Amino acid sequence: MTQAKESNFISAVVYLRNDAARVAPFLAAVCAQLEEHFAQYELIAVDDCSTDGTAQAVRDFAAQNLTKPLTLLHMSLAQGVELCMNAGQDCAIGDFVYEFDAADLCYDPALIWKAYETALLGNDVVSVGDRKSVV
């Protein structure tokens, strides 16, 4: 029996800086988790003035793989993680917002779902890191 997908709208904001080589596998892993568990979601990729073709790699991935919306923000000057994530949050419309501060899943992608379950328990902020724990 297939489990019903969650109806909450999810926004996933990812910071990118010269990540052309790894952005496609990263987005594929995140999208696989979101697609498995959520009926509706959006991706927001914030390109922090990359010089290696990161923005084009995101566009190529979206054209070939996505059925859900993707917003690509391109910073004309390098802003750093915090300001870029704030810009991505400003665009997010989700009931829940995931923030990825690098295009690198250094933990089991299943923790994306576990973080959501933990948030539903009433936690305003849930953090996942490379120790494979949800706090």
Regions found by a protein language model. Name each.
Residues 22-24, 52-61:
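Acidic helix N-cap motif at the loop->helix transition within catalytic regions
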Residues 47-56, 104-105:
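A conserved acidic beta->alpha catalytic loop
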Residues 75-92, 110-114:
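Glycine-rich, basic loop-to-helix element that forms the pyrophosphate-binding segment
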Residues 1-32:
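N-proximal low-complexity "stem/linker" segments adjacent to membrane-targeting elements
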Residues 112-132:
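Conserved donor NDP-sugar-binding/catalytic core segment of glycosyltransferases
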Residues 79, 103-106:
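Acidic metal-phosphate-binding loop of nucleotide-sugar-dependent transferases
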Residues 39-49, 73-74:
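Short beta-strand/loop segment that forms part of the nucleotide-sugar
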Residues 97:
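Short aromatic/hydrophobic "clamp" motif used to bind/position activated sugar donors
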